[in-house]
Amino acid sequence: MDTKTHSLPITHTQLHSNSQPQSCTCTRHRQTFSQSCRQSHCGSRSRSSSQSPASHRNPTGAHSSSGHQSQSPNTSPPPKRHKKTMNSHHSPMRPTILHCSCPKNRKNLEGKLKTKKMAKRIQQVYKTKTRSS
């Protein structure tokens, strides 16, 4: 009975580890991307930073418990964890940088346009004054 029960969890965890991260990383990547976009528009960064570690801790806890049952597939999860951390770190950072830079650029561009318009007006006024006198 030990061999049957021992072989089932190994195959189950292998199927789990192979099927779960692919589907989870895709859905999580989309969720974190959409959440970070929504939250960056609102301006609340604390929610995105608190949610990404929470969603990050859940799969590691689930994988570590399954890893304790069998040590042989324990060599495959660490690279997958690294990939998850890289994806989770990159996905929130990119949208926040883009969204943060856009309003600043817009403000800077608006300010530059205003100063250019003012400079043109001043030059026109100066030209008309010199011509009239």
Swiss-Prot record:
GO terms for cellular component: nucleolus; nucleosome. PROSITE patterns: TP2_1. It is found in: Nucleus; Nucleus, Nucleolus; Chromosome. Coiled coil: none annotated. Residues 1-104, 114-133 are annotated as: Disordered. Zn(2+) binds at residues 12, 16, 24, 26. InterPro entries: TP2 (IPR000678). The keyword S-adenosyl-L-methionine does not apply. Residues 34-52, 61-72 have a biased composition (Low complexity). Keywords: Chromosome, Developmental protein, Differentiation, DNA-binding, Metal-binding, Nucleosome core, Nucleus, Phosphoprotein, Spermatogenesis, Zinc. Residues 1-26 have a biased composition (Polar residues). The modification Phosphoserine is found at residue 133. A motif (Nuclear localization signal) lies at residues 111-119. Its main location: nucleus. Testis. One of its GO terms (biological process) is penetration of zona pellucida. Belongs to the nuclear transition protein 2 family. This is Nuclear transition protein 2. The lineage of its organism: Eukaryota, Metazoa, Chordata, Craniata, Vertebrata. The gene is TNP2.
